[in-house]
Swiss-Prot record:
Subcellular location: Cytoplasm
Cystine pairings recorded for this chain: none
Name by which UniProt lists this protein: Uncharacterized DapA-like lyase PAE2915
GO CC, one annotated term: cytoplasm
Gene Ontology molecular-function annotations: 2-dehydro-3-deoxy-phosphogluconate aldolase activity; 4-hydroxy-tetrahydrodipicolinate synthase activity
SUPFAM superfamilies xrefs: Aldolase
Lineage per the UniProt record: Archaea, Thermoproteota, Thermoprotei, Thermoproteales, Thermoproteaceae
SMART domains in the record: DHDPS
EC number: 4.-.-.-
PANTHER family named in the record: 4-HYDROXY-2-OXOGLUTARATE ALDOLASE, MITOCHONDRIAL (PTHR12128:SF66), DIHYDRODIPICOLINATE SYNTHASE (PTHR12128)
Organism the protein comes from: Pyrobaculum aerophilum (strain ATCC 51768 / DSM 7523 / JCM 9630 / CIP 104966 / NBRC 100827 / IM2)
CDD domains in alphabetical order: DHDPS-like (cd00408)
Similarity remark: Belongs to the DapA family.
Length: 301
């Protein structure tokens, strides 16, 4: 499997009593109809760590149904140990997902040997396509490129690596050392176009939840060699990404990252996102007004 293009890390609409599955169905349908290459509902953006195992499975069953073979379906583990990672991966395999993204261990910062041992234990038991992942915002560390290199060299089911570090030097190392063997996928909207220009194969991104086809157009422009046009689109979106909090992950709005994406999706599509799962805070009135202003300037609402 060669992963290329734009896979959308979808936001998760909630009702008071659980996941709003009809709202999720509508959002997934819009993304698939827009022509995106894949959907990824059990993502960090989708608040995967706050979903029960049963909710994760049902969400992925719905995604598989809506995608209907038109888009890849990727599932995230959202777990921090090898036992629960293997368990949820097997459940996802039964659903029929196309690939799983493995969240690295979190809470404790691990050394190279411990990380390698984690991947080995998981990959010895999981035989469907796997995307490796680094997200220091959640784990407190960046998985060393050399660990990914060792794991990918040993396990043929590893097909890609998603980088949500925001560290572009690290990202270039991934492209240089792994890009001929694996799909290197950018995880931050702000860095998508620069990554493509430097040889990344695509991205797993949250912006397409509310940007229509803009992110897809960026990808296609770079593929067609129309770099200046892609950069122009990138620059047009910079006020949005700066407001969202520096790559949508860190900065002045830090912990509001998922909820800002959810609010933007609600404003653009009219899908009720419901409350965030605690302890995520709701967006306050000041930030809501600023977000509405930016979306209006972009012609999205």
């Amino acid at each position: 499997m060669k992963l290329e293009g734009v896979i959308v890390a979808t936001v998760m609409p909630f009702a008071k009593d659980g996941v709003n599955y009809e709202g999720l169905r509508l959002l997934l349908s819009k993304i698939v109809e827009a022509g995106y290459h894949g959907v990824f509902p059990t993502s960090s953006t989708g608040e995967v760590t706050k979903l029960s195992a049963e909710e994760r499975v049902r969400v992925m069953q719905l995604a598989k149904e809506v995608a209907g073979g038109k888009a890849l379906v990727v599932a995230g583990t959202g777990t921090g140990d090898h036992v629960s990672t293997i368990d949820i991966a097997r459940k996802y395999k039964d659903v029929g997902v196309d690939a799983i993204l493995i969240t690295p261990p979190y809470y404790i910062q691990y050394d190279w040997a411990a990380l390698y041992a984690f991947y080995k234990k998981v990959l010895d038991k999981v035989d469907i396509p796997v995307i490796l992942y680094t997200i220091p915002l959640a784990t407190g560390y960046n998985v060393p490129v050399e660990v990914f290199e060792m794991v990918a060299g040993e396990y043929s089911q590893v097909v890609g690596v998603k980088d949500s570090s925001g560290d572009f030097r690290y990202h270039l190392d991934l492209i240089h050392l792994l890009g001929k063997r694996l799909s290197v996928l950018q995880g931050l909207d702000m860095l998508f176009v620069p990554s493509l220009v430097m040889g990344a194969h695509g991205g797993i991104l949250a912006g397409p939840n509310f940007l229509g086809r803009i992110t897809l157009e960026q990808y296609l422009l770079v593929k067609e060699g129309k770099i200046a046009e892609a950069v122009a689109l990138h620059n047009k979106l910079m006020p949005l990404w700066r407001f969202m909090g520096g790559c949508g992950l860190v900065g002045k709005l830090g912990g509001k990252w998922p909820t800002l994406y959810k609010l933007a999706t609600q404003l653009v599509h009219g899908i009720d996102m419901g409350p965030p799962r605690e302890p995520l805070p709701p967006v306050d009135d000041k930030d809501r007004r600023e977000l509405e202003k930016i979306l209006k300037e972009l012609g999205l609402i």
